Amino acid sequence: MEDNNKTREVELDEIKEVCDEQTSSMIDETVSDMLKFVQRYDSKENYEFCQKHEATCFGVFTMGGVAYQNDNRFWVNPKEPVDPDYKEYIIDMLSSMISQDIWNTFIGHEELAFRVFLYGTHYIREEELGRS
């Protein structure tokens, strides 16, 4: 018997169906940029994970960008070592902000969720620096 209360991971195509053409195009561009960050700074395995779970990773990436826009202290250079307490803080924050069934995607990949969040902060920072 199927559990009707259980949600599933949303596909990006489903999200884009309810968006106008411009927003849909922006989502495609941002997902492409997110994957470039993962490919640039991370392992092939993690890149493939993010490709497989685009919508979930896109959500975490976007959360990083929004966090940076609200407080630029969230930014950490993805090439630099990270304070373990900061990493734990972000992982705890993500796990409490994302619904449990969606967060389950990252069980065993919590550090990747943290890094995708950081890539989101870095993405917005690069955009801001490019505009100045």
In which residue ranges do the predicted regions lie?
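Generic detector of low-complexity/intrinsically disordered segments
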Residues: E14, K36-F37, S96, F114, ...
